[in-house]
Amino acid sequence: MSEEIFHYEIEDEIVLCLNYDGMYGINNINKIRQGANPNKEFTFGVDTYKIGDRILFNDCPRFNDFLFNNLKGTIKDISIDAENKCWWFTIEIDEDSVDLEYRPLDVATLDSEVEGKINVRFKVNEFADKEEDENEYGHIIPFNLAYAISIHKAQGLEFESVKIVITSNIEDRISKNIFYTAITRAKNNLKVYWNSDSQTRIFDSFQKRNSNKDIAIIRQKLKQ
């Protein structure tokens, strides 16, 4: 495998994997890529975040349809309010990805220095407090690191650059549909990291279960 997997080449880039564990799993790639971020660490429970980290929002009922599941963002600011025992996060997102009519009262919107972007600001309480929390999700961080994500999680998303990691121990889990989902996440740059034996076995398995036309489409996509 190439060390390129652990380094960004362009701003809007993602690494897609099937497995979470191991050297080339989602967890380790996220850890290494976050480690290359020179900004200060902020530890919230067992999680660590830095300004500049790439994130994806989770399906959090707290934000209704505003900050929705799989919304891409970048952490622009983190501040700790020790007196009120909470954290404040400012996240930069695509302006056209949200409808301001759905903005909850506990989310502020701020101008971004980047054209086509908008910043959203909200707090996360350090502890669950039924008396102070407006809902039961006020102490839950509503996003995860997203330098690397699963192929399943990437459905419906697009990135300028996509790097797909396929190790020999998970190649039997790669169906044609999973592989096609992965390679079609890339708008422009696409790289697949696998060894020649894995590539041969995967395409042989596709050949047995799918038409030659389907395989030709996939091969053509990889050449683009």
Predicted regions and their residues:
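Core RecA-like ATPase module of SF1/SF2 helicases and allied nucleic-acid translocases
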Residues: 2-224
